[in-house]
Amino acid sequence: ALGVLETTVVLDDGWCGHAAGQFAFVTSDKREGAHPYTIASAWNPADRRLIFITKALGDHTSRLRERLKIGMRVTVEGPYGRFDFEDNQPRQIWIGAGIGITPFVARLKQRAAHPDTKTIDLFHPTAEFEQAAIDRLTADAEAAGVRLHLLVDGKNGRLNGEGIRAAVPEWRSASFWFCGPPGFGEALREDFCANGLPLEQFHQELFQMR
């Protein structure tokens, strides 16, 4: 998609593995220091690869396409984060807004390899549409047994709590997992809590890309 970069890093020994939804700090330029990136791949110790998907949202991420070169060395610290999809609810509702879809891509791949019994709906509101990327996401969701709801700005309207409740009438038995613009996540959390959802059932990834 426009402005989106997928980067693969092959790790030396020392990485202990990660869970879907976690992130790492990556340093590609010591003068700028480390920046957080959500890991978009399930861990496979046989190939020791991490995939990061980034979008040009600020000065640092806008320069990555020109800065990163095949074969260059980077420093990776982590994994960090507790966005681990672990809970006791029978259903989960995932909301990956824009580039916030990244942790869910990793979880889809992990779930396809290790299925569980939860019923899951994944909402992906996005301002940009690239057929190849949507086809990959659709295939990953089908392989994982997850129901995908795609909403493109200007075509399907904006996602809100009312729309989610209409699409998933059983939402009260679900936990919510959100990654995307913080203000959007806070608005959804307030909406659902006002409609009776316990606060502890709404999980939000908090770090922001720069």
Where would I find each of the regions flagged by the language model?
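Ferredoxin-reductase
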Residues: 1-75, 92, 112, 118, ...
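Short, conserved phosphate/pyrophosphate- and ester-handling motifs at nucleotide-, phospho-/glycolipid
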Residues: 21, 100, 181
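Reductase modules of NAD(P)H-dependent flavoproteins
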Residues: 46, 59-61, 66, 72, ...
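Phosphate- and divalent-cation-binding pockets in alpha/beta enzyme and binding domains
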Residues: 63, 84, 103-106, 187-188
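A short, basic/flexible loop-to-alpha-helix module at the beginning of a structural domain
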Residues: 77-88
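Conserved beta-strand elements of the Class I
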Residues: 91-95, 177
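Histidine-anchored nucleotide/phosphate-binding helix
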Residues: 101-113
